[in-house]
Amino acid sequence: MANLTRRQWLKVGLAVGGMVTFGLSYRDVAKRAIDGLLNGTSGKVTRDRIFGNALIPEAQAQTHWQQNPQQTIAMTQCFGCWTQCGIRARVNADGKVIRIAGNPYHPLSQEHPIDSSVPFSEAMEQLAGESGLDARSTACARGATLLESLYSPLRLLEPMKRVGKRGEGKWQRISFEQLIEEVVEGGDLFGEGHVDGLRAIHAPDTPIDAKHPSFGPKTNQLLVTNTSDEGRDAFLRRFALNSFGSKNFGAHGAYCGLAYRAGSGALMGDLDKNPHVKPDWENVEFALFMGTSPAQSGNPFKRQARQLASARLRENFQYVVVAPALPLSTVLADPRGRWQPVMPGSDSALAMGMIRWIMDNQRYNADYLAIPGVQAMQQAGEQSWTNATHLVIADELPTLAGQHLTLRHLTPDGEETPVVLNTDGELVDASTCRQARLFVTQYVTLADGQRVTVKSGLQRLKEAAEKLSLAQYSEQCGVPEAQIIALAETFTSHGRKAAVISHGGMMAGNGFYNAWSVMMLNALIGNLSLSGGVFVGGGKFNGVSDGPRYNMNSFAGKVKPSGLSIARSKTAYEASEEYRDKIAGGQSPYPAKAPWYPFVAGQLTELLTSALEGYPYPLKAWISNMSNPFYGVPGLRAVAEEKLKDPRRLPLFIAIDAFMNETTALADYIVPDTHNFESWGFTAPWGGVASKATTARWPVVAPATHRTADGQPVSMEAFCIAVAKRLHLPGFGDRAITDPQGNTFPLNRAEDFYLRVAANIAFMGKTPVALANQEDISLTGVSRILPAIQHTLKADEVGRVAFIYSRGGRFAPEDSGYTEQRLGNAWKKPLQIWNADVAAHRHAITGERFSGCPVWYPARLSDGRAIDDQFPIGQWPLKLISFKSNTMSSSTAVIPRLHHVKPANLVALNPQDGERYGLQHGDRVRIITPGGQVVAQISLLNGVMPGVIAIEHGYGHREMGATQHSLDGVPMPYDPQIRAGINLNDLGFADPTRTITNTWLDWVSGAAVRQGLPAKIERI
């Protein structure tokens, strides 16, 4: 028993005295209170009579930083969500992670990060005492609790093979070597008949179908999917695309934010990388958030939350959040910001209404929009330009419709240079003109004698906005006409110190054009790369390139995938054999059997469902690395799960994962993967950081997964290396990597790859990073991996790579993101008021030409039918939306503490709807959609627009430990709490207009639809 002081006796007396007043029925409570004071609340004596069992501090900082010699503070990467912040992990002498906080060197964890040149101990001192009040570097709820998943009993640590039928949840242990043998060589693996292994599938010289050579080689019958780039994407792509050579690779973007990214890419003129912008938080005067809610969601999540909080302190800052449900970004008591409700999937009606008012009232930046080229931009002292004045062929003519008029069209020997109408009314080369006319409609005679109508890009946008009146736009989006005008007027009243940003709220049945129209508002005021406007990120130190120390991109025998992706990405339907065969047979080529996506890539939403239907060809194997479409894609479970359980449709399924997610549970083989704190990797901010930055992840503790025969931890990398070496694929093995001098180096272990990437990062630019000193190496725990660094790298690389890991990455000075009045990286391409690449194509189902500029389309199905026509509002009066949780993410369900904070997700309805359906706050209801039904507890909140059900995302798992499996006949650990709540994606549905069955997708980009699902509700 701990010794009692007089003060403690007084506390006991006060506690007992207070409880006596509650009567004898509370004697047990009183007893527990006394026991807690005497012996600790757990019944065990606490380590300290004052601090209880609190962690021993990592250091004392009274005069200078004196770190606890029993702890190291490792700077690494978080993976609690897709922001992937830099964090610091406290690791004790036993090699156990005991606490997580933020990395003060990292721009995603510190609003104004500490410069990397500051020694580690000095940086830590700045976080302590009074200075720590201003410079505290923290982690969010997900990051702070991520260590619990590292030690979760739900982790998968050894290779497993299914027994019984696919999806039954019965497994057996196998060695890593047996797993490699079976998946490579194939055979009668499950007593269900022969299964081709990866050796048989890897046939780069054999066509899938000799009658359809455009499909490409049999190698394409391997699908590889990755959750996304959590730091190791480059390694997996090296294996799948450039070593094995498959065309079919996918990531989760199609069910995360593809509609927004593609719409943004259309404006930015880059539909390959789909770049996007973020606001200059320190100088913006008016911010409009449409489809994103900083502090509630968005990326970077934590950084934007801090920046919004700081911006609120400025007198000249205002903001509006446009969303169907009130987010944490704004509160009713905040005079700086307000919430504007909007109907789900109607953002472009609001945006186009604003654009119409801006056009009608000439509130656009005319001088900026009149700049027709780079030379004129430089002469005007601008930082960006648009193609608003470039002339577009408006007539529906083969190969010409929607294309920009060029000098080649006017004269046979002319160049492919856009043409504008200058201020004197003359047709001139856009690159030599200083100012061009904004609004043009006139006839032009082409070199071949054709007389065509041409219009300027801005004229086309104006006409698109004029398709509806403000009253009609108001009716479509549910925002009063006066509010549309007020938003447009306010947005254009701050010069260029206004900004619009968006993200996942665009994932609707018209998401691509929603996103493009929203982001177009930035172009109309000319705010790109300017103080108070928006900017593209500062970029990253790309060590996976052919860098200063190693060629990490090029290697002998590197394969360029060929043929057709099953998702039909970046391929025009009109170039397909299906189209040509229909034309040859005298048929109308439209509709195709399924949508094609001529200018957008990344449709994991199409890859699996198309393969299971054998269109355009079947798959033979799937390797999934942590991907989980069966949890993340609305309606996919109902559409595809039973089909995937049939091995005849997809004979071999290998999942690489640290946990049994909803998709991994359907696999034939499971390769256990290392945890975030056990693995290597490199990531970079998605946006919102003006300076260049790259995060370094490294094994701060020893991996817990089983070992291979040669001592490697089993992981994604170990699997790829073993398969590649067994098949003698290029890019792996003893002589896989070269340096600029032609020397060769091995790729036999994960660190062979990542440490050489780190060396490239360390030496990039005019000056390499500094050498790490011994104190930094020791205090940050880099000493644990120093032997691997010394063994793998050249002597002059060791100290600089150690420096990279001691800082958790490489970060350019914060002020490097601001140069000559420009914020962030320069954007050299013209903003696309009219995108001719989009306008060049037709929709493969309806045959209609895609609009080359933003325009209002209602949410629609694949055949062009409006969703409300297929599912009438009279029968389906409500619309479902999902919103990001600020505590739980889809991958953190295995963390118990997050469930303790919030056991189930919020499912919210407006009180007006509650009254309409006879519901009280807390009632249990049945939510029904065309795809299914779930039971939930409803909350009645004024912060939800009438007609909307808002569902918090991240809950309602069926796997991730929610269901018990068996291993060698022994029940595996599980936690039924993980099943709590509901998942909106279980309510998604199949598009009834499609021939090749799939879920409801955005008709342009193929992005999953999770905003605006038709629904109804019943009280239970």
Swiss-Prot record:
Signal peptide: 1-33
Residues annotated to bind [4Fe-4S] cluster: C78, C81, C85, C140
Top EC group: oxidoreductase
Name of the molecule in the record: Tetrathionate reductase subunit A
Domain 4Fe-4S Mo/W bis-MGD-type: 71-154
Metal-binding recorded as keyword: yes
EC numbers on record: 1.8.-.-
Induction of synthesis: Transcriptionally regulated by Fnr and by the TtrR/TtrS two-component regulatory system.
Cofactor note text: Binds 1 [4Fe-4S] cluster.
PROSITE patterns referenced in this protein's UniProt entry, alphabetically: 4FE4S_MOW_BIS_MGD (PS51669)
Protein topology in the membrane: Peripheral membrane protein
NCBIfam families: PRK14991.1
PTM comment, free text: Predicted to be exported by the Tat system. The position of the signal peptide cleavage has not been experimentally proven.
Gene: ttrA
Compartment(s) of residence: Periplasm; Cell inner membrane
Species: Salmonella typhimurium (strain LT2 / SGSC1412 / ATCC 700720)
Subunit and interaction comment: Probably composed of three subunits: TtrA, TtrB and TtrC.
Classification via SMART domains: Molybdop_Fe4S4 (SM00926)
GO terms assigned for molecular function: 4 iron, 4 sulfur cluster binding; metal ion binding; molybdopterin cofactor binding; oxidoreductase activity
Phenotypic effect of disruption: Mutants are defective in tetrathionate respiration.
Keywords: 4Fe-4S, Cell inner membrane, Cell membrane, Iron, Iron-sulfur, Membrane, Metal-binding, Molybdenum, Oxidoreductase, Periplasm, Signal
Known cofactor(s): [4Fe-4S] cluster; Mo-bis(molybdopterin guanine dinucleotide)
